[in-house]
């Protein structure tokens, strides 16, 4: 997913809902400047210990202040915050360049159909339930968001 997202070394990337760091590890290996956002205090502490070179925010992802410079998001956020998160990321003034978000497949399809003036939204890779531990009750897809030029 990180390779498909086109993450480049030195690029600022948010991992929202970082959990135990599965995506974070790939982002670090890609050379990204990672900001991991995690609501669970134990997981946030574990992320700090496991990845000392990144910034970890113990915070509600829907309440964080987005970076004031261009950034990407590569994340598997909690499904319950998908709509609020997309509203924030796509809001006027956001410096979002691109996002690759693992979402509930129905939500990804809904947003891909919607019109967005400043961004293109498409459904990318489909992920079956068995791709996750523990498996969710729904299938997932990557929502690919790119800023229009």
Indicate residue ranges for each PLM-predicted region.
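Catalytic cores of RNA-modifying enzymes
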Residues: 1-149
């Amino acid at each position: 997913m990180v390779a498909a997202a086109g993450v480049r070394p030195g690029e600022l990337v948010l991992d929202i809902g970082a959990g135990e760091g599965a995506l974070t590890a790939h982002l670090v290996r890609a050379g990204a400047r990672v900001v991991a956002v995690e609501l669970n205090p134990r997981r946030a502490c574990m992320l700090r210990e496991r990845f000392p070179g990144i910034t970890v925010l113990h915070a509600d992802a829907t309440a964080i202040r987005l970076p004031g410079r261009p950034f990407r998001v590569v994340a598997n956020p909690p499904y319950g915050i998908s709509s609020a998160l997309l509203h924030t990321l796509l809001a006027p003034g956001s410096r979002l360049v691109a996002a690759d978000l693992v979402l509930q497949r129905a939500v990804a399809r809904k947003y891909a159909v919607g019109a967005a003036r400043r961004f293109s939204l498409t459904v990318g890779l489909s992920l079956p339930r068995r791709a996750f531990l523990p498996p969710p009750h729904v299938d997932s897809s990557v929502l690919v968001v790119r800023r229009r030029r």
